[in-house]
Curated annotation (Swiss-Prot):
Cell compartment(s), UniProt: Host cytoplasm; Host nucleus
CC annotations in GO: host cell cytoplasm; host cell nucleus
Subunit structure: Influenza RNA polymerase is composed of three subunits: PB1, PB2 and PA. Interacts (via C-terminus) with PB1 (via N-terminus).
Main location group: host cell
Function: Plays an essential role in viral RNA transcription and replication by forming the heterotrimeric polymerase complex together with PB1 and PB2 subunits. The complex transcribes viral mRNAs by using a unique mechanism called cap-snatching. It consists in the hijacking and cleavage of host capped pre-mRNAs. These short capped RNAs are then used as primers for viral mRNAs. The PB2 subunit is responsible for the binding of the 5' cap of cellular pre-mRNAs which are subsequently cleaved after 10-13 nucleotides by the PA subunit that carries the endonuclease activity.
Organism the protein comes from: Influenza A virus (strain A/Udorn/307/1972 H3N2)
Name of this protein: Polymerase acidic protein
């Protein structure tokens, strides 16, 4: 239908219809029949006016386009097709100069010969039904109604048809042609059935009696009755004279609306300072797995058993030593903690029966690393009332950090494919109704695109770690429990695989409130040398713990194996959300689904199959300094998933604030791109609100950098 409209109607009419739909928040790609109806109505209004002039004697004459008498006065003033502000301005001007009564609703034309407003109707139904609806809505003697149908019928107030027979015949012929063209393309039935009646719901609710008196009493100042207020609201333009409206509201409010032009926005200012550091709860692209395929050992599925089995697959252990110290920590304690883990795992192996869980000995190094006895003593406030200089302790402002390239690399890596399958088909949920056949198909296509994705690995890793940590926090509150960091996947051939990333040691965890913190020490394997990007690993103490033999195209090579150790903390509420990271799959699937829906409504059939199977088509993925990046539909799926996963991994107040505030600026820029002529006040205040969220969070800084790329290319 959209293609038909663009071919059938004058481009100026199409542009006006697009503008009208955008003004009312309607999507022409979805509401295609409405798009066609608006274009038809606009064209009939213009045809009604065409060639009709008033001569010097005040008589109505018809003049063809090539006639030299172009200085004659147009008989009709066209109101339809203007934006609401301008349309009401024209109506008010006509009323002031002619003395005509102001209509309650915007009419389509004004007839200078008959001195009356005209409402034009074009209907796919019976003309008399549509006429009655219009008359019931307008409820005005002063607006003349003229209805045309696609079958050649017409109806007008008091059978006064205003125009000569030839002009009306031209309109009827055009409508009949549009109908024939639609029918030839199989569009007419859908178009005919889609017409809705005029909205008259408010007219049916007459307010009487006590409610009417209350309504009249509760009006804003300067309004004598409800009718006056209604008329004012109907004529009120949300985009017009906001300054005046604000100043009426309050003496303190003073806002000047500035036009928002292509040259108005400036880039968001990113902070200067040392580079930002890695702050996720576990390693992402730098993680290394010790894996076993087709596990069938005794106790398979018990984390500690699986961990010991994975540890046995590696033979390159060596005496550990520190290669990158933590600047503020007691680094020997981190080294001793790892040695203690190795020793206690060895002790377990020497036992006849391996226990299901392992509680670590409460050594001095672990007490230090887990902050045991470090919390300040809590004192009841009532016991402190008499202390004269009681005050909240001073806390330092967080140090500003600059964007670093590692976070973009992390994101790129999260979008990539791995050689393992991380989710089974049912991770997103089973069907619950027969109507979900299309939903199943979409889910299966989507799952196929993301099941190998590294972001999906992060989801399963996050779910496992948070579930294990929350369980241990509740079941062993006083113990320093050793928790293996494990994930499960399948190889391309379908063989099961169990992976060990490292270990967590949990501190004391008497978690009464959702926000109470449990400390933990994480120890994670990696092949990444921390000395290459030391700023990324500011919070870590990194040990070299072994040498790993790797097969490559040129044969075997030995690489040092590192252990990234750090103290960290989390809370019940954070673990609860971490356990639900599978929601990221659902969120990104819904985003893809809205893209499919938009495409399907244009083509007027379900486009799921074509959407996923047309490998030649590319889609916009995001903005970069080079411009709009495009890729396959699979790449779009994986990018959307990675964004959702990173929003979960790097969740923070800074991200919440930046997302909420930058969205406002985004909406204004989009309005500018849609030629809606937006206006703003206190744009500086909005920039301030955005930039106060840019402190030190790597994911927020990267999003701000992307936003700047978007601004650059959107406003060219």
């Amino acid at each position: 239908m959209e293609d038909f409209v663009r071919q059938c109607f004058n481009p100026m009419i199409v542009e006006l219809a697009e503008k009208a739909m955008k003004e009312y928040g309607e999507d022409l790609k979805i509401e295609t029949n409405k798009f066609a109806a608006i274009c038809t109505h606009l064209e009939i209004c213009f045809m009604y006016s065409d060639f009709h002039f008033i001569n010097e004697q005040g008589e109505s004459i018809v003049v063809e386009l090539d006639d030299p008498n172009a200085l004659l006065k147009h008989r009709f003033e066209i109101i339809e097709g203007r934006d609401r502000t301008m349309a009401w301005t024209v109506v008010n001007s006509i009323c002031n100069t002619t003395g005509a009564e102001k209509p309650k609703f915007l009419p389509d034309l004004y007839d200078y010969k008959e001195n009356r407003f005209i409402e034009i109707g074009v209907t796919r139904r019976e003309v008399h039904i549509y006429y009655l609806e219009k008359a019931n809505k307008i409820k005005s003697e002063n607006t003349h109604i003229h209805i045309f149908s696609f079958t050649g019928e017409e109806m007008a107030t008091k059978a006064d048809y205003t125009l000569d027979d030839e002009s009306r015949a031209r309109i009827k012929t055009r409508l009949f042609t549009i109908r024939q063209e639609m029918a030839n393309r199989g569009l007419w039935d859908s178009f005919r059935q889609s017409e809705r009646g005029e909205e008259t719901i408010e007219e049916r609710f007459e307010i009487t009696g006590t409610m009417r008196r209350l309504a009249d009493q509760s009006l804003p100042p300067n309004f004598s009755c409800l009718e006056n207020f209604r008329a004012y609201v109907d004529g009120f333009e949300p985009n017009g004279c906001i300054e005046g409206k604000l100043s009426q509201m309050s003496k303190e409010v003073n806002a000047r609306i500035e036009p928002f032009l292509k040259t108005t926005p400036r880039p968001i200012k990113l902070p200067d300072g040392p580079p930002c550091f890695q702050r996720s709860k576990f390693l992402l692209m730098d993680a290394l797995k010790l894996s076993i395929e087709d596990p069938s050992h005794e106790g398979e599925g018990i984390p500690l058993y699986d961990a010991i089995k994975c540890m046995r697959t590696f033979f390159g252990w060596k005496e550990p030593y520190i290669v990158k110290p933590h600047e503020k920590g007691i680094n020997p304690n981190y080294l001793l903690s790892w040695k203690q883990v190795l020793a206690e795992l060895q002790d377990i192996e020497n036992e006849e029966k391996i226990p299901r869980t392992k509680n670590m000995k409460k050594t001095s190094q672990l007490k230090w690393a887990l902050g045991e006895n470090m919390a300040p003593e809590k004192v009841d406030f009532d016991n402190c009332r008499d202390i004269s200089d009681l005050k909240q302790y001073d806390s330092d402002e967080p140090e500003l950090r600059s964007l670093s390239s590692w976070i973009q690399n992390e994101f790129n890596k999260a979008c990539e494919l791995t050689d393992s399958i991380w989710i089974e088909l049912d991770e997103i949920g089973e069907d619950v109704a027969p109507i979900e056949y299309i939903a199943s198909m979409r889910r299966n296509y989507f799952t196929a695109e993301v099941s190998h994705c590294r972001a999906t690995e992060y989801i399963m890793k996050g779910v496992y770690i948070n579930t294990a940590l929350l369980n241990a926090s509740c079941a062993a509150m006083d113990d320093f429990q050793l928790i293996p960091m494990i994930s499960k996947c399948r190889t391309k051939e379908g063989r099961r695989k169990t992976n060990l990333y490292g270990f967590i040691i949990k501190g004391r965890s008497h978690l009464r409130n959702d926000t109470d913190v449990v400390n933990f020490v994480s120890m994670e394997f990696s092949l990444t040398d921390p000395r290459l990007e030391p700023h990324k690993w500011e919070k870590y103490c990194v040990l070299e713990i072994g040498d790993m033999l790797l097969r490559s195209a040129i044969g075997q090579m030995s690489r040092p194996m590192f252990l990234y150790v750090r103290t960290n903390g989390t809370s019940k509420i954070k673990m609860k959300w971490g356990m639900e990271m599978r929601r990221c799959l659902l969120q990104s699937l819904q985003q893809i689904e809205s893209m499919i829906e938009a495409e399907s409504s244009v083509k007027e059939k379900d486009m799921t199959k074509e959407f996923f199977e047309n490998k030649s088509e590319t889609w916009p993925i995001g903005e970069s300094p080079k411009g709009v990046e495009e890729g396959s539909i699979g790449k779009v799926c994986r990018t959307l998933l990675a964004k959702s996963v990173f929003n979960s991994l790097y969740a923070s107040p800074q991200l919440e604030g930046f997302s909420a505030e930058s969205r406002k600026l985004l909406l204004v820029v989009q309005a500018l791109r849609d030629n809606l002529e937006p206006g703003t006040f206190d744009l500086g205040g909005l920039y301030e609100a955005i930039e106060e969220c840019l402190i030190n969070d790597p994911w927020v800084l990267l999003n701000a950098s992307w936003f700047n790329s978007f601004l650059t290319h959107a406003l060219r």
